[in-house]
Amino acid sequence: MEGVVKMDNNYLVDIQHERLSFFTPAGEVKALNDVSIHLKEGEVLGIVGESGSGKSVTAYSLMGLTAYPGKLIGGELHFNGHEVEKMTEKDFSKMRGKEVSIIFQDPLTSLNPVYTIGNQIMEVIRLHTDADKKKAYARAVELLSLVGINEPEKRMKQYPHE
């Protein structure tokens, strides 16, 4: 990543004491207060919480997708040793989908009901890698298994509503 100093640590994701607020005409809304996450390569994290607890805001901030009027007001975010706040849009474009992704909790609103789950996952894999259909299929099955989806081969052929 151009112009971004790489930190020496063994974490792929290293969020330390993140504080993020949204500055609205009505005042400051504190969305995240002292969030810390440390993940090594190969680890999988599921963030679970009540609606409005900051799950999406945390993920978006790591991927450089915090929408205005959101602003990081404290803490440090590193991905693969790189300081997220100093990354460019070009850096994020290379990272998103290939190195880090979000799977939203409601597949009925996140996946297209016209296409199988497998086709949609494979499309993202092929978009961000040089994998052919066979390799993309194998990787998609592996990812479904990795996150605890039972019978991943069967799920690949199903539609989101099934």
Where do the model's predicted regions map?
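ABC transporter nucleotide-binding domains
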Residues: 1-162
